[in-house]
Structure formats: C-alpha cells, structure tokens
UniProtKB/Swiss-Prot annotation:
Subcellular localization: Cell membrane
Regions that span the bilayer: 14-34, 53-73, 80-100, 113-133, 142-162, 169-189, 202-222, 227-247, 263-283, 302-322, 333-353, 359-379, 405-427, 437-457
Taxonomic superkingdom: Bacteria
Gene Ontology terms for molecular function: transmembrane transporter activity
Broad class of where this protein is predominantly found: membrane
Family (UniProt): Belongs to the major facilitator superfamily. EmrB family.
NCBIfam families: efflux_EmrB
Signal peptide as annotated in the record: none
InterPro entries tied to this protein: EmrB-like (IPR004638), MFS (IPR011701), MFS_dom (IPR020846), MFS_trans_sf (IPR036259)
Pfam families found in the cross-reference section: MFS_1
UniProt name for this protein: Uncharacterized MFS-type transporter YcnB
Amino acid sequence: MNTSIEQKPFNRSVIVGILLAGAFVAILNQTLLITALPHIMRDFNVDANQAQWLTTSFMLTNGILIPITAFLIEKFTSRALLITAMSIFTAGTVVGAFAPNFPVLLTARIIQAAGAGIMMPLMQTVFLTIFPIEKRGQAMGMVGLVISFAPAIGPTLSGWAVEAFSWRSLFYIILPFAVIDLILASILMKNVTTLRKTQIDILSVILSTFGFGGLLYGFSSVGSYGWSSSTVLISLLVGVIALLLFITRQMKLKKPMLEFRVFTFGVFSLTTLLGTLVFALLIGTETILPLYTQNVRDVTAFDTGLMLLPGAVVMGFMSPIIGRIFDRVGGRGLAIAGFCIIFLTSLPFMQLTDHTSLAWIVVLYTVRLLGTAMIMMPVTTAGINALPRHLIPHGTAMNNTIRQVGGSIGTALLVSVMSNQAAHAGTTNVKHAALHGMNAAFIVAAVIALVGFLLSFTLKKPQRPAEQQPAR
C-alpha cells in the first residue's frame, strides 16, 4: 500500500545537481586515501595490513548498507534520506579530519561509508523517477560520469595533497563541498519518490550483512592471503551460507527487504550479469596496471595515477553522450561494441614487456575505458527499464550490490591468476616473473570480455516500458 506524501513541484535540474555533487564527493572518498596510506602508517605507527582497512572498511560498509537502501527508499522521503546520508558523511569527514589515533580514523571511514552507501542507489532511483523512460539513458549517463570520474581522480588528488600538505588535508578539502551540498539539499531538495508501508526485518539485515559482507571480505582478501587461506575460505563459506538463508527468507516474506523477484525479468537478469562482468574487468584492470607500472617499470604512485587519468576523463566525458545514444538505439549495439573494444585492448595487454611504451599503455587504457562506458550505464538502464516502477528501488539496490561483489571477484580472480603464474614462471628474475603473471591475467580478462560480447547479442529491449508493466 502506498503512503500519501505531498510532492510539491520541483526543479529537475536543481535535484540533479544536488545529487550529482553529493554522490561525487561520496564516491571520491573510495580511493582518496590510497596514496596517503604510507603517511598515515608513519603518523599512527601502524603496519600496511592495518592501514589497508581504511579502504577495505569503506568497501565493506558500502556492500553491507546498499542492500538495505531499497527498504530505506520506500520507508523515508527522498529529501529526508539525502539529508541524512549527507549528514552522516559530513560527520565522518569531520571526525576523520581531527582523528587523534588510528581507531578513530577507521571509525570515521566507516561513518563516511555509511553515508556514501546510501547515495548511489538513492541517486539512481531518483533519476529514474524524475526522468521519463525515453530520457533515462541521458540521466544514467550523468550517473556514469560521477562513478567513473570521481574514484579515478582520487589517487591523483591524494598524491598532490599529501605531498603539498598532509593526509588530513584530504578531509579538509572534502568538508566544505559536503557542507555546501548538505545546506543546498536542506533548502532545495523535494520529495519525488513514493513511500510504502514497510517494516524492517532485523533477521534479514543480519543475514544480508554476513552474506554480502562475507563475500566481499573473502574475495578482497584473496590477493593478500591466497585462496587456501582459512581467512578467505571461512569468510566465503559464511558469506555463501548467510546469503542463501537471506534469499530464502526474502522469497518467503510478504514485504521483503530486498526483492529477488527482479530476476524474474529476463532483461534485468542479463543486464545485471553484463554489468557485473564489465565492472569486474574494470576493477581488475585498475588493480593490475598499477602493479605493472610501479613494480615492473618503477613508476611512482602519483605518476601512475596521472597515467590512468585520461581514461577516466574520457569515460566520464563520454558517459552522458553515450546515454543519449542509448535513448535512441537501446543498449544491445552499445554493449556489443563495448565488449569488442575491451576484448581487442586485452590482446596487447597480454604481451606486456619491461620496455612497452608507457604512452601506448595510456592509449590502450583510455580506449578500454571508452568501451567500458559503452556498457556500464547503458546495460544498467536497460535492465531497470524492464522493471515496473515499484521495483525500481529494489533493482537499483540489487544492481549496485552485485556490482560491488563482481568487482571484488574480478580483482580476486585476476590477482590470483597473476600470482599463481608468476610463481610458476620458471625464472628467478622477479620482474620477468611478474610480467608473466600479468600477461596471464589479461588472457583471463580477454576470455571474460569475449563471454560478455557473445551474451550481448541476446540482449533485447523489454516488451513494454516500466510504466506500462503490470503491478505484481
């Protein structure tokens, strides 16, 4: 049953601007501390494994909270939810800026992630609500700009700020933007979503936390501990069991926290798979290439960030344009072309040497991210368009959750292939062994891209737009 909430006339451009700005600063924080970790380790006297939790905890909190956002979006108004999310994020930023020790800084990151985890599904749901179906590609293209550009400039901005000032400046830089967006949201944001009478199921929250949290932590730990590690195996086992129990419970509940029946829509299921494949390739590539430039070519972390920046700029710039193309031609052709580009750029990456032109690598990576932009938001939009309006919050939450898991799986798979092949390279030269492993990892990436390419041919437009789908 819907809850009647007064929806006053709203300025769509204002809402879009507020949400994009809030999401940008929130998503930027995912990668903002990467190059600052050595400085934090020195100041707080912690080792690399402890410091890594500043990024791992952010990812885990996001992965745990995102599945709950479908319930939150149905329970609370879009205005209240945005203000709450930005308030939580801003509070975490303040705590981080003045953290006296490492535990407080880690707590600040978790608080930041709690706010950021709400932002992405909320932004997608609001955009899909306020834009007509024939303009959703354009809307999601703007989302693509944020999720591609924001995390990419994180390491570059971090490298500059830490060298010029201190790691605390990263929080000082973010804070005014977060405060301004919070003030604007309080004044200008309107309610645009429809509320429903729903109650939180505590057991579902617990199972979701252990399910998705276990999988994310398990897969993200493979690179550090290996597949045979008890940490990895126990985390994955707990995650799988909890997730199966979670799915079973959701199917039995009259009003589930996360509606798995979105997968009864074939187009949504296929596009979610395609989106997961391309995100796994994206995160996996962004993990392998810095290892190549820094460990094999002795390029600094800051310069590596600069090398990856053109690809992020192209991906961000092209996302809105590709969104408009999607509105005209649909997602099938874009996905086919995108996976083809990723496959073709994987071939040269399979033949990296210790003297491969760095400029050539920048060109390949930039073209590769153009292909990624042709897939990521178009297939997401195509899948959401197949859902009836009342399932859109569940579709966006499901899509973002599975993307997080897919990214961790992609990284785990490629890093484990790289490590295994490097260990059996038959050479005592460490750099040559690493190269052998990296080339093998890109062979796997090429196979994944080929699978995505073939699956893209089966993508069809939904028979009826979401507004015309019968309620279930």
